Amino acid sequence: MTAEIRSVSYRELISGNKNFRNLWLGQIISLMGDWFNLIATAILTANLTGSGLAVGGLFVIRSLAQFVSSPFGGVLADRFNRKKILIWSDILRFFIVLGFLLVKDASQIWLLYTLTALQLGISGIFFPTKDAILPDVVSEDEIGTANALTATTWSTMLALGAFLGGQVAGTWGIAPAIWLDAFSYLLSAYFIAKISYTQTTEKSEEPLRATSVFKLSFQGFGYLSEHKAILILATQKASLMLAVSGFNEVLQVELSSKVFIIGEGGSTGLGWLYAIVGVGTGVSPILARWITGDRERGLRHAITAGYGITLIGLMLMYPITSLELVLAGGFFRGFGVAIIWVFSTTLLLKKLPNKVRGRVFGTEFALLTLAGAIGSGLGGWFLDAFNMSLQNLILL
């Protein structure tokens, strides 16, 4: 009979694990900038084009860029020093984001799309690597706490970053939000550089060629096909992106720019919509984990409950009779989605061997971004091609 693993507290983890603390601080700063950027580019696209399809296209590009790059990111994370990959990803994104300052009118929307593809393509390498390095900088009894804190931080920065990003863009314009996003990457790289990290990935005598990278990237799919229990866990996020989140990306921009217009071009309103989702996603992993602990059975039951809570949120949003009701629906939608997202990741972290961790997380990320692209693309297309109401988009 194996002894039950003790879960450390959040305070113990942050104060006692310097490496995790630096990784976490880098995450806080870069995520804050990311949400500034998303608000800025979404509102800029809506204002320049006035098209739901164009807005949907932005989110399709954001998703597809990560879909293409994330399997290769997983290969790199299993082959090279994960810390260096994270640092260089941040530095490259700093220079790319500054390019958004050049977009001034609708004729340059191609440039906005191109820069978005480059930025999110590198993010598709960064995020699987960040997931893969987490068990390298925490002990086994810290994994559940670290993953919950990481997810809560994402949610908190969604709430705070989206709110502040909306306020900044709505009050002072798009450019300050872009500058803040760019410099957030440099600060993130600084904190990651402070991590004391010894490479745990397996070195190979075979040189890494383009063909071998392509071949290795598909090993994540192969592993999932041979391990059905892992496959179910790894497709939870993709299911959410296809059925819920992809459509809602377009829906929120449409609501803020055409229905509840607050701030310049609806920037402030969009920030509020993202922020309330962030509040829901922030509190739910902590509350749910307080009930379930890190026990596998409890985590699985919570994932099931998360789908029901998500449905409640969508039902509250459906009438679109008031901003308050839409915000309440967004809170519950975020609450349910976060339970599914965080607990499926916790189970994967506990079950995946180190040698395939990067490729499996890369594959998972590819699937969820592809699903998000399909959801966003269909949402924008339905709005423009069929003149679909926002209520019917929620029903879908």
Located regions from the model:
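C-terminal transmembrane bundle of multi-pass solute transporters/carriers
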Residues: 68, 72, 85, 99, ...
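Short amphipathic helix-loop junctions that connect adjacent transmembrane helices
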Residues: 39-52, 250-267
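Conserved MFS/SLC helix-loop-helix module at the cytosolic interface between two early adjacent transmembrane helices
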Residues: 66-103
